[in-house]
Amino acid sequence: MREQLMAAETVTGIEWHDGALHLLDQRLLPLEQCWLTCTDVAQVAEAISEMVVRGAPAIGISAAYGLVLALRQRLAEGEGWEESLEEDFLMLGEARPTPANLFWALNRMRERLQRLRPGDDVLAVMEAEAIAIHESDREANLTMAQFGVEQIRKHQGSEQALLTHGNAGALATGGFGTALGVIRAATLEGMVEQVYVCESRPWLQGSRLTAWELAADGVPVTVVADAAAGHLMKTKGISWVVVGADCIAANGDVAAKIGTYQIAVAAMHHGLRFMVVAPSSSIDLNLATGEDIPLETRGVEELLEVAGIQVTADVEVYNPVVDVTPADLIDVIVTEKGVVERPDAAKIAQLMCRKRLH
């Protein structure tokens, strides 16, 4: 299956070449494919905060490359570059508050910086580390796809209907995708009859990005309104909900695209299985439960306006980007380190003690 998956990779949103970070502007998809080139850390931080690049793994990868750009500038400034670089770590860390992968990538880059030896080519070493973060995410995607397919096959081997929410595909990662990686792999195995994609308001990551990715791969896909998810579960024979994650707490609670929680509640009511697919870098053992995860809110214009035109009266707006799905609503968490069924704190701790693959 691995060779099939690698051959099927058709979409990428992150490229590093010619000493610059190149990002596919996800705000414009699918109508326009425009690549933005970032040559300094401020541009990378802005690209993250303004949703040019999104998806927790992709944000972490972009931040790692952003530090390489920052380091190049600081080294050129001369003495005191280590202290100045701390400002760049802070800038990138403040770009988005929720994705655990962002802080994981920054910490990994910091740790590599601290292990430098006299005579090392600092810039070359740190560039190699950022590339390794990118490549390891791609490898993790392939491994998770295989693990996820095994879970689906174990419970039902015939063709079936799946539901996903948000975008956890190639655009959100460094490779094949997390949730969409599993869905793509299941399709290659002849196990998917239909994929239903929630539009995922207000940024429409489902209808704009996920549907575009799956259609490009020839996966049978149908877009539905977010509010139709419960009705679909009742009438369309869906067997699995498969989603990604921005952050997973130590007890298995999952922060993900807003609307994931209510889908999980509906799935539990209808007896459907609920799968979360995310690399181990999305797990933060310093966060005991979902109550400890910082949850991002965004600007009012995302709900008040459509295509720049105000369509709602001037009223109070609350625009959370993510919500928390409690672990007891989740059947399985799939990572590159392994699979956790019916997650809890003990199982998550055991998973994270395994040999580091990512």
Curated annotation (Swiss-Prot):
Span of the secretion signal?
none
Q: Does the keyword Isomerase apply?
A: yes
For this entry, the protein name equals Methylthioribose-1-phosphate isomerase
Tell me the residue numbers annotated for binding substrate: 54-56, 96, 205, 256-257
| Role, per record | Catalyzes the interconversion of methylthioribose-1-phosphate (MTR-1-P) into methylthioribulose-1-phosphate (MTRu-1-P).
Question: Could you give a GO molecular-function term held by this entry?
Answer: S-methyl-5-thioribose-1-phosphate isomerase activity
Q: Which organism is it from?
A: Pseudomonas entomophila (strain L48)
Organism classification: Bacteria, Pseudomonadati, Pseudomonadota, Gammaproteobacteria, Pseudomonadales
The residues annotated as the active site are: 246 (proton donor)
The processes (GO biological process) annotated in the record are:
L-methionine salvage from methylthioadenosine
Q: Which PANTHER family match?
A: METHYLTHIORIBOSE-1-PHOSPHATE ISOMERASE (PTHR43475:SF1)
A Pfam family recorded for this sequence: IF-2B
What pathway is it annotated to?
Amino-acid biosynthesis; L-methionine biosynthesis via salvage pathway; L-methionine from S-methyl-5-thio-alpha-D-ribose 1-phosphate: step 1/6
SUPFAM superfamilies recorded for this chain? NagB/RpiA/CoA transferase-like (SSF100950)
Q: Which family does it belong to?
A: Belongs to the eIF-2B alpha/beta/delta subunits family. MtnA subfamily.
Q: Which reaction does it catalyse?
A: 5-(methylsulfanyl)-alpha-D-ribose 1-phosphate = 5-(methylsulfanyl)-D-ribulose 1-phosphate
Alphabetized InterPro entries for the sequence: IF-2B-related, IF-M1Pi, IF_2B-like_C, Initiation_fac_2B_a/b/d, M1Pi_N, NagB/RpiA_transferase-like
Q: Which UniProt keywords apply?
A: Amino-acid biosynthesis, Isomerase, Methionine biosynthesis
Task: Tell me its EC number(s), please.
Answer: 5.3.1.23
